[in-house]
Amino acid sequence: MASGDTKTSVKHAHLCAERLSVREEEGDAEDYCTPGAFELERLFWKGSPQYTHVNEVWPRLHIGDEATALDRYGLQKAGFTHVLNAAHGRWNVDTGPDYYRDMAIEYHGVEADDVPTFDLSIFFYSAAAFIDSALRDDHSKILVHCAMGRSRSATLVLAYLMIHKNMTLVDAIQQVAKNRCVLPNRGFLKQLRELDKQLVKQRRQAGPGDSDLGL
């Protein structure tokens, strides 16, 4: 049973990869299907090896680590106006509104654990809305961080790009991975795949008129 499931999964992954190639060549979004976890992980592996404390992955949108979030002077000097902490909480990166109270920084916390069984998807839309609201102001600059800036924070940024920038999961991964070495855990990747399927279905039903389903 397990062997058969593996073969089916690999076959599906190769089929999706072939369809992705066709879509890239012909520009036909109707041929897109959500790739399997292995194919998606390969996209991350092909990305940038760059892994510093913080990297800009989209205009004025940065993914960073705990050290970046704790450096109040550095945040102020860099001009950050918003912070989304994907590892909020006493036993994670324990900052919060009070930590930035004397700074011109708007804070949003997501109390999440970096384990495959944690349901981060319940925060996808609220986190994406916070990022989108911040970036609507041309003078804003947002840091999305967790402990290492690789899994939780990257997952929320990917969800934002999918929800508000009309990207497929593949597009979003390629955008982020070319600027920072990230890799969501398998559980988060599964949740992003489900979001991708939902958004693709909704957009096909809505037609070309509605581009931003996050609103």
Swiss-Prot record:
Listed EC numbers: 3.1.3.16, 3.1.3.48
Record localization: Cytoplasm; Nucleus
Reactions mediated catalytically: O-phospho-L-tyrosyl-[protein] + H2O = L-tyrosyl-[protein] + phosphate; O-phospho-L-seryl-[protein] + H2O = L-seryl-[protein] + phosphate; O-phospho-L-threonyl-[protein] + H2O = L-threonyl-[protein] + phosphate
InterPro entries tied to this protein: Atypical_DUSP_subfamA, Dual-sp_phosphatase_cat-dom, Prot-tyrosine_phosphatase-like, Tyr_Pase_AS, Tyr_Pase_dom, TYR_PHOSPHATASE_DUAL_dom
Active site: 146 (phosphocysteine intermediate)
Tissue: Skeletal muscle, liver and adipose tissue.
GO biological process, alphabetically ordered: glucose homeostasis; muscle cell differentiation; negative regulation of ERK1 and ERK2 cascade; protein dephosphorylation
Keywords from the UniProt entry: Cytoplasm, Hydrolase, Nucleus, Protein phosphatase
Keyword Cytoplasm listed: yes
Pfam family, one: DSPc
Gene3D superfamilies recorded: Protein tyrosine phosphatase superfamily (3.90.190.10)
Enzyme class at the top of the EC tree: hydrolase
A GO term for molecular function: protein tyrosine/serine/threonine phosphatase activity
PANTHER family to which the protein is assigned, alphabetical: AGAP008228-PA (PTHR45682), DUAL SPECIFICITY PHOSPHATASE 29 (PTHR45682:SF6)
Record's function text: Dual specificity phosphatase able to dephosphorylate phosphotyrosine, phosphoserine and phosphothreonine residues within the same substrate, with a preference for phosphotyrosine as a substrate. Involved in the modulation of intracellular signaling cascades. In skeletal muscle regulates systemic glucose homeostasis by activating, AMPK, an energy sensor protein kinase. Affects MAP kinase signaling though modulation of the MAPK1/2 cascade in skeletal muscle promoting muscle cell differentiation, development and atrophy.
Subunit structure: Homodimer. Interacts with PRKAA2.
Family note: Belongs to the protein-tyrosine phosphatase family. Non-receptor class dual specificity subfamily.
Protein name: Dual specificity phosphatase 29
Organism: Mus musculus (Mouse)
